[in-house]
């Protein structure tokens, strides 16, 4: 197996500093890993992965740590790993831009996002502060060009978005609110339009006075395609149209500053989202959210 040493400290403390750890090894072999910030070259990567003997090989970027099956890296990434891990770093940083973390990262935390592949038939998932992929799912997005031209960046960006959706992860919205982040990644990549249902479905929803979501917590009943469109419409208006280019960063800061937010009933959290969004926009957005069903009572 692989040995990982976690070093946690208060980065604001005067004595917080990098330390060196020596671990005497009585057996086994050093498999090595690729560090973008230290090695940077394809030649070094090729040498390291060819000499590695373990089932997994680690690629360390500036923001992302990929712990993938070595056989898949040899198959799909024999000589373009620098561009590949750089793209994953972009996925993370672009989502950080929406979250407005400049005041707390890296001053308060500097950990990487971890992504691992596993030996099972699973697809893609997120949990416990990391993202994961079934070994066969890697085939969908490991060739670098697929991240650009075949919309395959959506899957990894969607899972990374799960790590960042906490303030808007309302019951009935778990698989949709994170797509604010994956739609932003699509926009930044610049090859595809956004995902989500057309606004004609919103008109039908409004006509039938349907609520925005339900509180059953069942992803199968979640209106994911329409939900993600609402978050993106706000981005299009405030960011793309230049009305208020810091709308989402300031909104997420305000949500984070409410330390009691996740202890509130989900309905109250949604109403606070309406209030905070209006505060940040300096506009009364009640009509907008009413159109999307926020004000429609839920009896589920």
Segments and roles (model prediction):
Residues 40, 131, 295-298:
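A generic structural signal for solvent-exposed, polar alpha-helical segments
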């Amino acid at each position: 197996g692989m040995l990982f040493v976690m070093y946690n400290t208060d980065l604001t403390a005067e004595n917080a500093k990098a330390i060196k750890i020596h671990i005497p090894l009585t057996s086994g072999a050093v498999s090595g890993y690729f560090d973008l910030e230290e090695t940077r070259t394809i030649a070094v990567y090729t040498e390291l992965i060819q000499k590695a003997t373990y089932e997994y090989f680690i690629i360390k970027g500036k923001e992302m740590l990929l712990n993938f099956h070595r056989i898949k890296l040899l198959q799909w990434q024999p000589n373009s790993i620098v561009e590949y891990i750089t793209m994953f770093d972009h996925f993370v940083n672009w989502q950080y831009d929406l979250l407005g973390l400049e005041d707390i990262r890296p001053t308060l935390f500097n950990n990487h996002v971890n992504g691992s592949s596993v030996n099972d038939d699973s697809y893609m998932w997120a949990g416990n502060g990391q993202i994961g992929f079934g070994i066969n799912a890697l085939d969908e997005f490991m060739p670098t060009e697929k991240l650009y031209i075949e919309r395959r960046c959506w899957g990894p960006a969607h899972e990374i978005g799960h790590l960042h959706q906490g303030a808007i992860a309302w019951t009935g919205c778990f698989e949709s609110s994170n797509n604010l982040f994956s739609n932003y990644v699509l926009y930044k990549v610049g090859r595809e339009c956004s995902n989500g249902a057309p606004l004609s479905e919103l008109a039908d929803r409004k006509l039938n006075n349907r609520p925005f979501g339900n509180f059953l917590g069942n992803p199968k009943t979640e209106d994911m395609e329409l939900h993600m469109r609402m978050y993106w419409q706000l981005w299009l208006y405030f960011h793309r149209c230049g009305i208020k280019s810091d709308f989402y960063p300031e909104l997420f800061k305000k949500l984070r500053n409410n330390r009691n937010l996740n202890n509130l009933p989900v309905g109250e959290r949604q109403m606070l989202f309406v209030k905070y969004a209006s505060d940040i926009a300096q506009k009364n957005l009640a009509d907008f959210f009413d159109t999307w069903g926020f004000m429609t009572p839920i009896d589920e």
